[in-house]
Amino acid sequence: MEIAGKVIIITGGAAGIGAGLAERFHQDGAKHIVVADLDEKKVKQVAQRVGGKGVCLDVSNEVAIKALVAEVEQEQGRIDLFVSNAGYVSFEGLEGDIGALDRMWGVHVKAHVYAARAVLPGMIERGEGYLLNTASAAGLLIQIGSMHYSVTKAAAVGLAEWLQITHANQGIRVSVLCPQEVATDIDKNMYKSEGSVAAGAKMAAGDGVLSSAEVAEAVVEALREERFLVLPHPEVAEYAKRKGTDRDRWLKGMRRFQDKLYEGNVPPGEWLVSKGTLDTATGENQ
């Protein structure tokens, strides 16, 4: 897909990856960009910068997503690309609030389902359309310190795979974005924390912290090639391959790696463990 002339909706667009994508799509000649986020003030600022429309939206509300899609289709005649990008990170295990898991499931998984349910009928009728869902490298690997994030991001990857397999013959293309860490204010604060939060932040930054512009460049290239996996940190492909080759070895290595992280003995950049049995990554607060 080439971005020029396209009608695009981006959720989670007030900052980070979403804002970076909006700005890049504008530079590449998108016809119309709708930027949606809970932060109404910031999302309208982004929309103003890209000459688009800013909308206050809760992605866990299916009625609201359907209404937005219907409005854009009525005004623009079509939606070419829906970027389901909203997300956040928290670090909790089994002892954590189960309500927090429910909320994260709503944002990281059900929001993608709601978007697909709303936008696919029109795309299928036209015989073309593109879904870009933001997950995380944690969806391919794991996130030490966060059960909630690990589980929901893995589910997001699985959903994207299902959508691509099920609807490709109807002209629908699907990509899933799986970055490690991307520079945001929230990520900066994570480094000042302790325990699982700090460990998770160190882990995510193992292969470098990218700017939102660098992530947007990787996305545009992947969309142009209609590539399913979008990996701004290319190292993740090798990590996932090693995990698939010998999962038991990977799990053993990850346990040792986790111990080192919590002990504070793993400096930034020293992430391959157990003779190349990998680390993982998490991403961005989208």
Name every feature range the model reports, one short phrase each.
Residues 28, 141, 162-173:
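Active-site-adjacent segment of SDR/Rossmann-fold oxidoreductases
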Residues 66, 88-102, 125, 145-148:
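Conserved mid-core segment of classical short-chain dehydrogenase/reductases
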Residues 169-235:
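SDR active-site lid
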Residues 136:
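Residue(s) in the substrate-gating loop at a strand-loop-helix junction
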Residues 2-33:
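Canonical Rossmann dinucleotide-binding motif of NAD(H)/NADP(H)-dependent dehydrogenases/reductases
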Residues 40-41, 57-67, 98:
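The beta1-alpha1 cofactor-binding region of Rossmann-like NAD(H)/NADP(H)-dependent oxidoreductases
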Residues 116, 152:
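Active-site helix of classical SDR
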